[in-house]
Amino acid sequence: AGRDFHNFNVVYRQNNAYKVVAFTATQIPDIEGRLYPSVLSGELYPNGIPIYDESKLEELISEHKIEEVVFSYSDISHEDVMHKASRVIASGTHFKFLGGEPTMIQSSKPVISVCAVRTGCGKSQTTRKIAEILKASGKKVAVIRHPMPYGELAKQEVQRFTELADLEKHKCTIEEMEEYEPHITRGNVVFAGADYQ
């Protein structure tokens, strides 16, 4: 969860040609049974959008007569993606990826994206090193981190971290603190939250 919310926000939130019926998630504790809240999901979804455990994927496809599943997880291997695609296709449903262009954050500044196949590959360390190199060359640096949806999503719409007190202000989890604190102590501004727009 995290990248899927961003993809929804930029591609589907205001697109009445689609009806998004659910998000699925894995790896995030206690996310099942929660809602992507209406304050974030927009006027087409006044009741929010339910979040289910991925184990219910086939059940959701059948129950809601879903025509298309859009894959939006991050940190996953090709093999795992293809297993998920097989589950969807075996259920008689289209399986889709969104291309880069429609999901990119619009910026007037150059952007460097740091991605990897799974958690633990070194994205955080790589991001800190890139920021260090850019700052040493006189550039201003800000870090954007897709959300870690552990807390109350409506209160995580937009987050800006410039000092350690901001971690408490935004009620960050230990995982979030481990990610943001090294940037803050190095003087990097960190932006996170469920809605970058």
Give the predicted meaning of each segment.
Residues 28-34, 76-80, 151-153:
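Short, charged/polar "capping" segments at the starts of alpha-helices
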Residues 103-151:
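Walker A (P-loop) phosphate-binding motif
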Residues 1-67:
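A solvent-exposed beta-alpha-beta segment
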Residues 38-113:
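Short, basic phosphate-binding NTP loop
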